[in-house]
Amino acid sequence: MDVIRYDKELNRAHWDLLLQADPWFEAVQKYLPPQNPQAEVFFIGHAHKPYALCVAVPIEDGLEIKNIATRTIMRRQGMASALINHVLLVAKQRGLAMVEIGTSTTSRDQIRLYEKLGFKRDGILRGHFLSYPEPIIENGLLAKDMLMLQYKF
């Protein structure tokens, strides 16, 4: 599976995926170029219509995966794993110490995937999702807290 770095302006297909993972438009905008010129977007599929994509931003000693999403009909084909493994490789090649990712504590499948890939639970941001303009319901539960996970080299 080829992972490609995307450095052009994002189109509607990109935004559909980004908002699938994080429905707060203003929050997503803040961690993407041009507001965050250091953000990197990686995708699998076609540039104009990706099957899966992720956004990684630099943080102290590492990278944080701020957003990762796969088209619903393309799930369970290893694309999210491929994207995460690519970000891990990029971080390792740059000599960084770790990669971080956060998700709702109600995101059971995502947590299972991240732990399978070697991420360890690192903390909880209490009430993080309660600041969103619309409630997020996942697996029949209201998303309130964000679980942070880290992969250390």
Report residues per predicted region.
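Conserved acetyl-CoA-binding loop of GNAT-fold acetyltransferases
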Residues: 115-124
